[in-house]
Amino acid sequence: IWKGSQGTVTKTEERLIEQVITEYYDVFFNGFNGFTPPQREDLRKSLTIDDRNNKDKANESQSDKAMRIEKEIDEIERRRKELKVETLSFNSFYEYAMQRVPDICHENHIANIDYSTFRYMMKDFYRGGNHDKTLNEDLDSSLFDETFIVFEIDSIKDDPLLFPLVTLIIMDVFLQKMRIKKSRKVLVIEEAWKA
């Protein structure tokens, strides 16, 4: 969304967004109560490797270095614990991502992510933005219980921002309806060649 329909996403950006989405759902369904011992050990190893390139800390003793790394892990854990996801919506994802993306970039020393542009482009779909209803409408109450739905997309077929989003929403509604086994489902795409 933030790159537009003609933009390309780098592998780093793709992995970053995948991580944020995975963590977002994990926090909603399971919460985050802190790192497990294997996760702490993995972080410790990563931070130790990153620390080897830190010339400022070259004269630091091993115990001071270990203590500093443990404090850094505790700080990362504290920031993660503060992130709560109460409801699943684009608003809550936006709030989560705006805090988590800079943290992930800092923790992994990723310098080439332009999260200012990401934030600016996504804000249109956030609370109060021009398209805030597009991704924040409660599908369970508005579309999910309907027996017959018509999506008229002629007016947005040339919109590079809305057309891909509406297409994804249509597919999501259809896939969710497919999971209900009590009735027949039909997806009719009329004049598909125009879209």
Predicted regions and their residues:
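P-loop NTPase motor domains
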Residues: 1-195
